Design a protein with these regions (language model features):
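Alpha-helical transmembrane segments and their immediate juxtamembrane cytosolic regions
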Residues: 1-180
Length: 180
């Protein structure tokens, strides 16, 4: 966020406006074009935090702490990350923008992930509700294939099959495809 607020180039001087921010400027430097979907290359820096936090969560899960302590730590850090992420967004300091990976987005998304991890760890490892855990194991063992499948042929097939239900459901709620 500091770079977005301090490095203001002509035409790229609006920190959180799509196509007119530091990330868009850096895309023109790196590849001489701006991504039409608003994604920026420079967001690899803040999103590296997700990898680091994932490693720390993994270290916690394999530590000597009791399972209850692990759930408490995951939930506590999840709530703290949510507060750090949503606080600046709610006070209009830094908006949550996924495509440029603002600090608010990075913390808010990590908070949700840690809370979900705490819930799943509690359900599967503590309460032994693992009847359907094999599905997650299969997906985890084939994650690269699943990623590529849903970004190529699966994207067209899955979106077409699911769109009938999702568009109607979200349409009734007033959520447009642009928001999704």
């Amino acid at each position: 966020d500091v770079l977005y607020r301090t490095i203001l180039m002509p035409g790229f001087d609006q920190p959180f406006v799509e196509y007119h921010n530091f990330g868009a400027y850096m895309d023109t430097v790196f590849g001489e074009h701006i991504n039409r979907d608003g994604w920026v290359t420079i967001n690899f820096i803040p999103t590296a935090a997700h990898t680091i936090w994932g490693c720390l969560a993994g270290k916690l899960l394999v530590s000597d702490k009791t399972p209850v302590q692990k759930v408490k730590y995951l939930a506590l850090f999840g709530v703290i990350a949510l507060a750090i992420g949503f606080g600046p967004d709610w006070t209009h300091i830094t908006p949550i923008i996924k495509r440029i990976a603002t600090s608010s987005f990075t913390f808010a998304s990590e908070g949700w992930v840690l809370l979900l991890l705490a819930l799943l760890y509690w359900l599967i490892d503590l309460k032994k509700f693992n009847k359907y855990a094999w599905i997650a194991a299969v997906v985890g063992m084939n994650s690269i294939f699943i990623y590529y499948f849903f970004n190529t042929a699966g994207y067209q097939w899955f979106n077409g099959a699911v769109a009938i239900f999702i568009k109607g459901l979200f349409g009734m709620a007033g959520i447009t495809p642009k928001i999704l």
